[in-house]
UniProtKB/Swiss-Prot annotation:
Note: M.tuberculosis is assumed to be unable to synthesize conventional colored carotenoids, but the data obtained in PubMed:20929460 reveal that M.tuberculosis may utilize carotenoids from host cells and interfere with their retinoid metabolism. The occurrence of suitable carotenoid-substrates (i.e. beta-carotene, lutein, zeaxanthin and lycopene) have been shown in human plasma and tissues, and the apocarotenoid substrate beta-apo-10'-carotenal may also be present in lungs.
Family: Belongs to the carotenoid oxygenase family.
Entry GO MF terms: carotenoid dioxygenase activity; metal ion binding
Name of the protein in question: Carotenoid cleavage oxygenase
Length: 501
């Protein structure tokens, strides 16, 4: 068991539902209410930020915390174990007083920061993922750190937190960004052998934060939106005060004109005075647009479509269909009107996220936008055997009574089942003291309907201060089973079901 010192907080992203835990725990034979389906054989894993050392509440950004992965293993109708582990980056090893087992090569990505955003399995590996050019890590099945991952040297400069798995081929598609790439993002395909088989550099208007993208059967969809790299947030922690203004001017003059070599981009890893600020901010002068590229195309094949200024972390799904003889692209997204404008510590203070649908007529170039549900919601998931094709159902987590900025009695996190065909929705009947995070869809064996499956995700019962793994019927939203955990799991970001192979 490893324990870090807990820090006092005056930051809503360090409190309540979002507060970090200070102890690594291993527990076996977990108590269960209800019955775990016998066919579930694997691990539910979720990643999220969990600072290992004291941070400055005034500047700490939710997205910059050290990575901690939480997992529950299910087999034979039982919850075999729960584990939570920090990913052993050099900074985490130093904070815990442990030797650094493997230091990333500069080509692998930016060492500063941690892979705190997603966790999934691919080609026999468990991968802790992050974006912005930061190094990703491989974990063991028991969530201990193996070391940095660059797909056996086939992909340099970092990856993404949001790859999309092609349900037909099993390959991982991704769009990756980093300030070190200049005015470019990179589309990549990781084969089922775990190696990058294709990369394409795509020119964009600046240096945007591009958290995710959409994949259809025929296209890659890129969201080039007005949250961009802000050198003002980087310089103060890394250079003397008298050099700050010249350094900012240098960064602003270089950024986007050249691609920064990997060793130079990695220099910040050795600078003293780590900052917990996020170096991205709302940029009202930056054009908002959507790029559409054929899967086998290149930069010259990208078509750009202007949209109203906004920000999207999470597209729900995308597909194309024929309407009146024209090909139309349908994009379902969770949309914010702005991001990191007034509140620079997290996504909660600028606007409420709504579920929107954008359609692009690829023949005429016309773009239409429709708000499908204006209730605040996030973390959209579907039956991912349908990625890239038409879908009907989606599952989102609502945020009511204060968007991600506290865990008082006013905060609730309803679970919505969205019918994207009729526009209607159903709300799960959850205990009002239960706060939940992202819910993952796991299809049932021999499923005969799109929604024939299980929803799986972590919750916190604030009345009992208890962490839980919830299993819900995806058709009815009724409880199937609850696994009672030995500690609270912070809300975190993204997770996935990793079946035993």
């Amino acid at each position: 068991m490893t324990t870090a010192q807990a820090a006092e907080s005056q930051n809503p992203y360090l409190e309540g539902f979002l507060a970090p835990v200070s102890t690594e725990v291993t527990a076996t034979d977990l108590p269960v209410t209800g019955r775990i389906p016998e066919h579930l054989d694997g691990r539910y894993l979720r990643n999220g930020p969990n600072p290992v050392a004291e941070v400055d509440p005034a500047t700490y950004h939710w997205f910059t915390g050290d990575a901690m992965v939480h997992g529950v293993a299910l087999r034979d109708g039982k919850a075999r174990w729960y584990r939570n582990r920090w990913v052993r980056t050099p900074a985490v090893c130093a904070a815990l007083g442990e030797p650094i087992s493997a230091r990333p090569h500069p080509r692998t990505g930016i060492i500063e920061g941690g892979p705190n955003t997603n966790v999934l399995t691919h080609a026999g590996r468990t991968l802790a993922l992050v974006e912005a050019g930061v190094v990703n890590y491989e974990l063991t099945d028991e969530l201990d750190t193996v070391g940095p991952c660059d797909f056996d040297g086939t992909l340099h400069g970092g990856y993404t937190a949001h790859p999309q798995r092609d349900p037909h081929t099993g390959e991982l598609h991704a769009v990756s960004y980093s300030f070190a790439r200049g005015h470019r993002v990179q589309y990549s395909v990781i084969g089922t052998d775990g190696h990058a088989r294709r990369t394409v550099d795509i020119e964009v208007a600046g240096s945007p934060m591009m958290h995710s993208f959409s994949l259809t059967d025929n296209y890659v969809v890129i969201y080039d939106l007005p949250v961009t790299f802000d050198p003002m947030q980087v310089v103060p922690a890394s250079v003397p005060r008298w050099l700050q203004r010249p350094a900012r001017l240098v960064i602003q003059s270089v950024l986007g004109r050249v691609r920064i070599p990997d060793p130079i981009a990695a220099l910040g890893n050795r600078m003293q005075g780590h900052s917990d600020r996020l170096p991205y901010a709302w940029n009202p002068s930056y054009p908002a647009r959507v790029g559409v590229m054929p899967r086998e195309g290149g930069n010259e094949d990208v078509r750009w479509f202007d949209i109203e200024p906004c920000y999207v972390y999470h597209p729900l799904n995308a597909y194309s269909e024929c309407r009146n003889g024209a090909e139309v692209l349908v994009l379902d997204v969770v949309r914010y009107s702005r991001m990191f404008d007034r509140d620079r510590r997290g996504p909660g203070g600028d606007s409420r996220p709504s579920l929107d649908r954008w359609t692009i007529n690829l023949a005429t170039g016309a773009v239409t936008a429709e708000c499908r549900d204006d209730r605040a919601q996030e973390f959209p998931r579907i039956n991912e055997t349908l990625v890239g094709g038409p879908h009907r159902f989606a599952y989102t987590v609502g945020i009511e009574g204060g968007f991600l900025v506290g865990a008082g009695a006013a905060l609730s996190t309803p679970l919505y089942k969205q019918d994207c065909v009729t526009g209607s929705s159903t709300v799960a009947s959850l205990d009002p003291d239960l706060l939940i995070g992202e819910m993952v869809f796991v299809p049932n064996p021999s499923a005969r309907a799109e929604d024939d499956g299980i929803l799986m995700g972590y919750g916190w019962h604030r009345g009992r201060d208890e962490g839980q793994l919830l299993l819900l019927d995806a058709q009815t939203l009724e409880s199937i089973a609850t696994v009672h955990l030995p500690q609270r799991v912070p809300m975190g970001f993204h997770g996935n079901w990793a079946p035993t192979t």
